[in-house]
Amino acid sequence: GRCFNDLHWFDLKSLRWQPQLTTSKSPMQRSGHCACAVDDTMYIFGGNTTKNSFNDLWEFDVLSSVWRQIKTTGKSPSGRVGHTITALGPRLLVLGGREYATNYFDCHLHSFDVRTRHWSQVPLHTSSPRGGPPPLRTGHCTTVHAGRLLLFGGLREDGRFLDDITTVELIS
């Protein structure tokens, strides 16, 4: 299939998709990336083409319609697909996914602070009886509730589907 780098908004009043014209260079076309918003800024991370996985982070200012590639510090996550990115205050949490070319599954929770532009890793602790990190996965969903990251489903390294809901304790 083909990858694109165009941007569309869904208008909640008209219930229609609208193309968004931008006034800057857009990220390279890709699929399998994730996006989330903090205030008036949308962030995208990762994704791939048929040849490459990306570990770049971009921001789109909704008010000015401008894309910017973010120059970061710290150890950024490897390029990946099938991951999630979830906003928790000024932090973006990247979890799971796999490198497209090697099928390497990542076992770390990565945190990006939108104020300092710095990546760090966060210890993974679950509320499950066995404790420790949740099983490696791709294609899952996450959301934040009451300061915890809720993780649902996905696909394991061995190809089996997961139907669990795991609470990840976010330790500062």
Q: Which residues fall in each region the model found?
A:
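Kelch-like beta-propeller repeat domains
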Residues: G1-S172
